[in-house]
Amino acid sequence: VWPRGIECQMYQAHLGRVFPIRGATLEGGEMIHDASNPPGQWNTFEVYSEEGRVATVLNGKLVGLASNADPRIGHIALESEGVPTQFRNIRIKRFSPTHHLRDAPGPDRR
């Protein structure tokens, strides 16, 4: 069962892409570039979300940017789709706006 929401892709070939699933909507979200480490090495993956803007940062580099995301609130889920996946040092915390989200397009930036 796939919930309606915003997905931040962790599949190796598309790491960092942001896209809507099950009726959710957003603008943008394409993967900007590949910043992933080779298979077998750990990656650091950060997701920032504020007021409908979503930014993904992989190994310290901005790799995905979306705006006007709907829904803006909901559950956070981690999943592995058919391949072994390991997670470590998972943190969820509030933050003050970062430069990643200031760069995101939005209705107030058109």
Task: Put a short name on every predicted segment.
Residues 1-110:
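Carbohydrate-interacting regions of secretory-pathway proteins
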